[in-house]
């Protein structure tokens, strides 16, 4: 693990950052020798990175693998060994010059095929997206219609409840409006002065009512037997009174006044 960390640090520092800065200096000074040197190095280092990805997966178990990789990077950069220029001139340049046409043909074919494949996949992706959008829209319309129906039913129930509440509120306001009127009417009736005649009439009526109440209370206090005796006596008295009245009328018959003719005859 420690060797892997050290190897990665060495590759990044000495294999990438330092050659990048040296290439910048070569471009700035326009030195052809340095420019060619670092161009050869970058070609070899690109091949090294591609081979490194494969060897890290296959040969990482090999002992001293990471130490050998550090030594190889230093060999490429050393101005004494000039490993990058040696590898490029002996192996890379001859192989690339021999396979250059084939490589160019592969590149052009890859471009054309990549364009065709990209267009094909793009069309398929658009078709899939369109079908997905249509299906989602249909499902969404169904869900929205169901929700709208449920909302419409809820709105109708809410409207009915609001109408009932408004009617109840109108009744309450009507009763609340009539109550102050009734109170004001009673206040005006109480405030209006009562005439003296009406007061005397009311007082006489109240006296009569009090007398009648006292009489009723006396009658209730009396026993049933005295009531029967009083009733029989009262029944006999009117009959006697009627006979006395008839006799008096007979006795008190009016006397006839003497006429003028009788007066003349009686006169001598």
Curated annotation (Swiss-Prot):
Compositionally biased residues, Basic residues: 249-258
Pfam families named in the record: TB2_DP1_HVA22
Annotated compartments: Membrane
Keyword terms of this UniProt record: Membrane, Transmembrane, Transmembrane helix
Chain intervals with Basic and acidic residues compositional bias: 199-216
UniProt-recorded Gene Ontology molecular function terms: microtubule binding; taste receptor binding
Bias kind Low complexity: ranges: 180-196, 228-248
Summary of the function given for this chain in its UniProt record: May enhance the cell surface expression of odorant receptors.
Family in the record: Belongs to the DP1 family.
Official protein name in the record: Receptor expression-enhancing protein 2
Organism of derivation: Danio rerio (Zebrafish)
Source organism phylogeny: Eukaryota, Metazoa, Chordata, Craniata, Vertebrata
């Amino acid at each position: 693990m420690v060797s892997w960390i050290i190897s990665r640090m060495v590759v990044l520092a000495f294999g990438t950052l330092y050659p990048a800065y040296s290439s910048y200096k070569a471009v700035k000074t326009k030195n052809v020798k340095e420019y060619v040197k670092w161009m050869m190095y970058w070609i070899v280092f690109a091949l090294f990175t591609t081979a490194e990805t494969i060897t890290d997966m296959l040969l990482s178990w090999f002992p001293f693998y990471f130490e050998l990789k550090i030594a190889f990077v230093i060999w490429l950069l050393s101005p004494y060994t000039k490993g990058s220029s040696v590898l490029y001139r002996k192996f890379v340049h001859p192989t690339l010059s021999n396979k250059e046409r084939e490589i160019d043909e592969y590149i052009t074919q890859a471009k054309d095929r990549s364009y065709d494949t990209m267009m094909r996949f793009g069309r398929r992706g658009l078709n899939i997206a369109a079908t997905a959008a249509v299906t989602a829209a249909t499902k969404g319309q169904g869900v929205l219609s169901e929700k709208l129906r449920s909302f419409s039913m809820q709105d109708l129930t809410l409207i009915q409840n609001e109408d009932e509440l408004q009617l109840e509120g109108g009744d309450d306001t009507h009763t609340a409006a009539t109550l102050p009127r009734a109170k004001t009417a009673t206040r005006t009736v109480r405030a209006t002065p009562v005439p003296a005649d009406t007061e005397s009439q009311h007082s006489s009526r109240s006296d009569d009512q009090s007398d009648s109440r006292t009489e009723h209370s006396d009658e209730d206090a009396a026993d049933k037997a005295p009531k029967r005796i009083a009733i029989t006596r009262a029944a006999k008295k009117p009959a006697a009174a009627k006979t006395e009245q008839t006799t008096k009328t007979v006795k008190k018959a009016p006397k006839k006044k003497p006429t003028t003719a009788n007066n003349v005859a009686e006169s001598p």
